[in-house]
A protein has these predicted regions:
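A structural signal for conserved, well-ordered secondary-structure elements
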Residues: 1-319
């Protein structure tokens, strides 16, 4: 039985991530950008101990109407709820004089006042004590910019090291296609965040770097199989580069799918059973693992095959 020609249909497989990325770009502009968390744009985060059922939407609506602070993000935690409020620095700048707004002490005071308003409203509504405030932290927008800069730097370093490693182990074309596949994975992850308007924070950066390392492993497995099977190439017998790559993909597909499924089961359990902080890490991992498996099978090796074939044809013409 003749197996489906994956290499021949490479552009059809590219269509799926292309549609997701396009949808992400559209939603990015519709939403006015990503939903950055306080680590990136500044704000206050606190954790409050609360017993019983916690309706986060009800608490959010109550706090926004009672304090006049918006937006407020409320999430459940193991011990109660976590509360995040963003754009506090911008609010402080509007409410203070222009020269005073640049003073960090004024901005910190504004953050403390808003945090105090939120907790006092909760205390009154739900009859809490001062001990219910488990933790409180704040971040400035300038700190957020530093975090973003470091995130891009670390990602770029990781990609360059991967490019170098694969170029040494295989060849430079394999390295280029592997990096392109990685970039597609990252774009898909960011697109899903734009579509779902999920808060983008430092946990996403950690998950993204994890996915980069995980997905490249699947790509290496496929390229390793291709390298082994290239010894059997015989154009006179119809065993071309495209044939070898298609066979190699099918031979390594079972391993890739099995590894991906077992990994996904673990991550899904973490997402379903974990607290908010665990869910924040598991969600991008789910997206990245699926995207990584897809790109390693249907994108990296297939487009490498087309590139390799066209390069060899060009050499023949020159001769």
């Amino acid at each position: 039985m003749k197996k489906f020609d994956i290499v021949k249909n490479k552009y059809k497989f590219l269509l799926i991530p292309a549609v997701i990325v396009l949808a992400g770009i559209i939603m990015y502009f519709v939403n006015g950008g990503f939903n950055y968390d306080i680590e990136f744009i500044g704000g206050v985060k606190m954790e409050v101990a609360m017993d019983g059922d916690k309706n986060t939407e009800e608490i959010k609506s109550f706090l926004e109407s009672e304090t006049g602070i918006s937006p407020i993000v409320v999430q459940t935690t193991e011990k109660g709820i976590s509360i995040k409020t963003k754009a506090i620095e911008e609010k402080a700048k509007k409410e203070t004089k222009e020269d005073a707004a640049e003073d960090s002490s004024v901005l910190n005071q504004a953050k403390d006042e808003n945090a105090g308003k939120i907790f006092e409203a909760l205390k009154t509504k739900y009859e809490l004590t001062d001990e219910a405030l488990l933790s409180e932290s704040s971040a400035s927008a300038s700190f957020g910019k530093q975090v973003q800069g470091k995130a891009f730097l670390f990602t770029a370093i990781a990609v360059l090291l991967i490019l170098l490693y694969i170029a040494i182990r295989f060849e430079w074309r394999s390295a280029v296609m592997s990096v392109i596949a990685l970039l597609i994975n990252i774009l898909v992850m960011m697109a899903v965040y734009a579509i779902t308007y999920t808060p983008l924070n430092t946990t996403f950066i950690a998950a993204m770097l994890t996915v980069v390392g995980y997905s490249i492993n699947n790509t290496i497995v496929v390229f390793d199989r291709i390298r082994e099977n290239m010894k059997l190439r015989n154009p006179k017998r119809g065993i071309t580069v495209l044939t070898v790559v298609n066979t190699s993909i099918w031979e390594s597909m079972g391993r890739t799918i099995n590894t991906t499924i077992t990994t996904l089961i673990t991550i899904l359990l973490l997402y379903i059973l974990g607290v908010t902080s665990v869910k924040e890490f598991a969600f991008p991992l789910i997206i990245g693992v699926i995207a990584g498996a897809y790109s390693s099978i249907f994108i990296a090796s297939t487009f490498w095959a087309a590139w390799k074939e066209s390069a060899e044809e060009a050499k023949k013409i020159k001769k």
